[in-house]
Amino acid sequence: MKRFTSSTGSFGSSIASLGNDSIKKANSLTSGILGKQASAVQEDREKPAIDPVPPRDTERPARILSLDGGGVRGYSTLIILKKFLLHLKAQSPDKKDILPADYFDLIIGTSTGGIIALMLGRLRMTVDEAIEAYQQLSKKIFAGGLASAVLDGSMLSSEKPGLGLGLGIIKGRELDQYMNMAVTTVMPGETSMYDAAKLEGYLKSTIGQQKYTIEREDALLEDEDKNNCCSAIVTAKQNNATAPHVMRSYVNPKDLTDDKIKIWEAARATSAAPAFFVPISIGLSKVKFIDGAVTGHCNPSELAREEAEAIWPGRKIGLLLSLGTGAPQEISLAGSNSSKLVSFIALSANTAQVHERVSRYFNQVCDGQSPYVRMSVEHSIDSIRLDDYEKLDQIAASTESYLGTENIKTRLDAAIALGARTNEQVPATSFPGRMGSRSNTLQQPLSPGGTGA
């Protein structure tokens, strides 16, 4: 009987190798049995081979990647990361491509930075795969929608109470928030300028096409393979938008939850910017989640440090690479409606404030040997709205120009050197305690190569 089973399996494989005509003939002679078996063999052969996740060394200092939110401006972070990995590859002995999920131990992001974090970490995509997916996401999701109605002036008329701009200089980040306010004011209730169902469909499709989650578009966020990179995204509960809510692919001993959240649900939650996408209800309790940037954590590098401390108590941090999406160069407001933008002005400046706190903290406790590096294209992409997918080429050009400057090349080399130290087991600095105690007398130090926000 065992021999017969083996022969049948071998014969099924042979039939499959003969092609469709032979399968049809075999199918008619065997009431479909061999045809079904051959089809199953063919399907197995068509599935891409999944490379095993290499063992992770948890004894060496940790490498962390933090990704800011910023809509289409997040494209810039992928270009910076690609340059970093190419330089890293050039300096490695074997000159092999480097997978972000294997190089970094923790990748955390907010908003579209959260989507990128899931792509690179949980889904184990290469940076080129993530760039292609991000381009497609931006074009498919942001084409159309209500944004044009807001921007063409029909919803910004001063004749409508409370909607007149009355503003002086106003740039992309401030305009993003004003659009939120305009739509919310005109359309009561939970409104959105873009189709959440379209976004969900694209996310599911992308997840189901990746080798690591092939044909599993509903794969859970929590990763069964503990060797894989830890991935985290920053969201907020709609009924408590002042506090960040971190969704994780790993277990945080200080925040044990069993939500059974799917990858696509996490991606939807972190990208649910008010008015751009409706909140998403997750779990049996149907808690509504929104974009974590509303909590003031558009730059999640501070949370990244705290997450690392919770996951690996006492473990040293060798590199914390924080990638931003630009910061406003000037903000000038005038008119009676200025107060409506106050909350967002604080938010738009928050990436710089978080950078200052993290930089100050590390330099204070590391005695000049900080593992923290911040890179962000300044004053050239900040005027681009988060949904302006037609500006991807401009974002790429500005980022390449930024990377070509000497001080940024120096900063890039500093980040690579910090990462190399983790391989050599050179002692880095561990950081006990939380960020609550910060010295106000210490001047803001520069991240390697200068400041960034």
Residue ranges of predicted features:
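Conserved catalytic cores and adjacent C-terminal regulatory segments
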Residues: 2-453
